[in-house]
């Protein structure tokens, strides 16, 4: 993705990845022997009007049906899922809107979207219920007294802002 205003190129944006999850309804916990699953591109479609342009990526992803009985790895049996990614550029708006459409039939996993920025930043901004929250990128230092190790993922609803004076 290239920012035509700055010339900055973002490589590796919108990477769909799926990982196992053996945590509870509150906490993500990856299985000891996890496998990362990525989708395959099936087709692309574009729609263009005077106001916006949308690229639709139709993907398929083969997800393990669940974790194994021991819950330390993912099952070898998989289900194929359709997944659509819509990337929309609106005229005069300096951002790309990304929507992911996916109907889940698998258990014990987490589907995510990664956006590499290549930027060196100390914090990021996230939308909360009533405010824009600023959080440090680096995880806090831990020791043996921590019952639960911190994770880099944080709650957000509709956007994340990772930027500095170079772009974002």
Could you say what each language-model-derived stretch is?
Residues 44-48, 88-91, 103-105, 150-152, ...:
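A general structural signal for short secondary-structure junctions and capping/turn motifs
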Residues 115-168:
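Polysaccharide-binding surfaces and accessory modules of carbohydrate-active proteins
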Residues 1-101, 113:
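Catalytic and substrate-binding regions of extracellular carbohydrate-active enzymes
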Residues 72, 92-135:
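Acidic (Asp/Glu-rich), glycine- and aromatic
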């Amino acid at each position: 993705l290239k920012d035509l205003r700055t010339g900055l190129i973002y490589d590796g944006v919108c990477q769909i990845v799926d990982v196992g999850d053996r945590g509870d309804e509150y906490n993500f916990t990856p299985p000891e022997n996890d496998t990362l699953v990525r989708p395959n591109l099936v087709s692309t479609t574009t729609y263009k009007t005077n106001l916006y342009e949308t690229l639709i990526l139709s993907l398929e992803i083969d997800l393990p049906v669940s974790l194994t009985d021991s819950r330390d790895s993912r099952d070898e049996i998989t289900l194929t899922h359709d997944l659509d990614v819509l990337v929309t550029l609106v005229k005069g708006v300096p951002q790309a809107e990304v929507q992911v459409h996916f109907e889940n039939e698998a258990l014990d996993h987490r589907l995510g979207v990664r956006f590499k920025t290549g930027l060196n930043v100390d914090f990021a901004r996230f939308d909360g219920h009533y405010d824009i929250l600023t959080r440090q990128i680096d995880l806090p230092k831990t020791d043996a007294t921590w019952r639960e190790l911190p994770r880099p993922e944080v709650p957000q609803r509709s956007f994340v802002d990772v930027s500095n004076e170079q772009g974002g």
